[in-house]
Structures are given as structure tokens and as C-alpha cells.
């Protein structure tokens, strides 16, 4: 069998046609483990936010119990920050600068997800904000869809290390991520309309509500953007 041509200066394990791995085997395993640890910590932050939102949308919710849940979100976000730094420090091997840059870009973008989770929780507590009760079901739905999005994103990132060729040939998982983002957009638009139709709310209250809605839905947008980054990364490795 003819071996794939590897241009001079390209580390072993990386082929110009997007081989099954981006790095040499040992380095591939190391970086795979580090970035998946980071994504797990980001996911834990999202799960903590889900608990916070569930408590904030429960009947009779008050601000004091949310303070402790907000603290949990912030602690999880800090852990995700530490994981990001650890992952970046692990990118010290002899592989293509473009690969290093792509991985850092994906990791730092995912870290923004944890940051947004923290923003939602702490700002809601600081401002003692609660979504209008009529919107609670839709807010919960947005969080649920966003979690599904992130689960798919985590799987797609993992495939970069173990099923690279498969992902190059069939990136339907990235389309699924974008499809879920469209679902979030649809629910977001409905909530926008719902809020501005509430005669009992002052304009300032409506603007505050849609501002928090924007921040919450930004998480879904970031996940979609990371999916786009992955697809660009794949395209750049096809010759």
C-alpha cells in the first residue's frame, strides 16, 4: 500500500489529506485528553446554570436560594478557566502551527460558553431579576436545547482526534448543531414578542428581560460558531 505523502516539515501522524489523527499518536492522546477535560468542565458550568435557571423559574422563587446556585456556577466557571490554561500549556509538541492555533481557538471559544453562564447567573442575582412567569417554559426550553447543542459539539471535537477522516467526509453533526441553534433562535423570537406584548411591564422592565434573554441565547450562538470553526478547520486540511 502506498503511504500518504507527508510534506516536509509536517509531523508524523498528520497528513495533507486530513488523516485519522492531527498529531502523532502519543501527542494526539495527550491533547485529546486535555481538551476533553476542558470541555467537560465547560459542560459542568452549563449544567450548573441549568440548575440555576430551574430554580429561578420555579413557582415562588426568591433571590436568596439563587445566591448559592450562582456561587456554584462561578466555581465551575473558574475550574473551566484552569482547564483551559492547562490545555494551552499542553500544546508544546512538534506539530503544525495551524493545528495549534485551531485547537487554541476552539478551546478559548468554548471557554466563552462558561463565561456566559457565569454572566447570566451573577447578573440575575445582582439585579434581582426573574423572567416573567409566562416566559419560564420557553426559557427552560432554550437551556435544554443549548445543552443538546453542547453535547453534539463535545462529540464533534472528540472526533477530531479519533475519527478525523469520518468527520471530513460527513460533518452532519455540525449541521445538527446549527439546526439546534436555529431552534433556539425561533424560541427566542417568540419570547421577544411575548415580552413586548406584556402591557403590565414598563418599557424598562421589557428591555431588562430581553437583555437577559440575549445573554442566555448567546451561549447557543457561541456553540454554533465553534461548529463553524471546526468545519473551516476540516476544509483547510483537504487538498
Where are these regions (language model features)?
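Cytosolic, long alpha-helical scaffolding segments
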Residues: 17-239
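Short, Lys/Arg-enriched N-terminal segments with co-localized hydrophobic residues
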Residues: 3, 8-21
